[in-house]
Amino acid sequence: MKIVAGLGSIDEYIPYVEAGADELFCGYVPECWSLKYGMENPLNRREVYYYNVQIGSQSELQIMQKMVERYHVPVSIAFNSLYYVPEQYSMIVDIMRQCMQYGYRTFIVADVALLVYLKEQAPDLWKRGMKIHLSGETAEVNSLMLEEFRKFMIDRVIFHRKNTISDMESMISGQKANHPEKQLEYEAFILNEKCHFTGAFCNTLHCDELAHMCRVPYRRGMIAAGTTPCKMQSDSASDCEQNDSNMTGVSGCGLCALWKLRQAGITHLKLVSRGNYVEDTMRDIKALRTALTILEHTNNEPQYVDHMKKELFPCGQCSGNCYYVVV
């Protein structure tokens, strides 16, 4: 399984590659889009101006492509807003053509109407080598949906955050059986920003002024009659307490599920990191690389989980914010 990490500026490319990323993805918002639509109609799912979360100029695209040629770690570009208005589609296609001119061929898309527009109005892009990754911001993912989306010549499915491992395995095995001539790639979320919703039904803003909802701490549990959440007692602190903000996977972690994800047929692992501190993302990439190395050298799932936790969580306390329920 390959590590796919998000970057927010070209300065992050080399550190993330050296940390162990196999692929990278980013957003690109050119000035023409910002001037006309601002952040009210975002080009991707980061409605942000004031910190590094987007590539913003053609020159940056050109510089980053030189890095890709040097390090051979590809970059895909996200056009993954949940929807666009009709007048925007022609501009989006123009931006995609511009990206392809500089060597970028892979785009992450969530809006079904954009896929329809591309197929009907810009079929030449596929002839030029365009690849489509179906975003984790797309709505429900099931076998019938995958059959329908094959009409748009997708190359990869990014499962959304609420797909169970058994669901993924069922869909992947079905696709392999029904389409042996054209195998897809399959990507699953593995670290950070475990959304309270699924991406398609998240209508919060990922912007400068408001905290991301996926980073607002919360706790699930039963509340006794007559008790309010603010009166609930917090868990007793461990004798070897860690700083939660520095813990791997504090906002979402699927490391324990790597064994089952591999069995299910997952080929790529998404590390959510656009806009995060560079040092934090490098730590996360290294931790995931360590977990994958342990996975390759253990004989069974309990052995893997035990070894991984001892290596990455030496105090014995992980975040407990699990992406997947592993039983």
Report residues per predicted region.
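Active-site pocket-lining/capping segments in soluble small-molecule metabolic enzymes
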Residues: 1-140, 159-327
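Short, glycine/polar-rich helix-capping loops at beta-to-alpha or helix-loop-helix junctions
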Residues: 142-145
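A cross-taxonomic marker for long C-terminal extensions/tails that follow the last structured domain
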Residues: 147-157
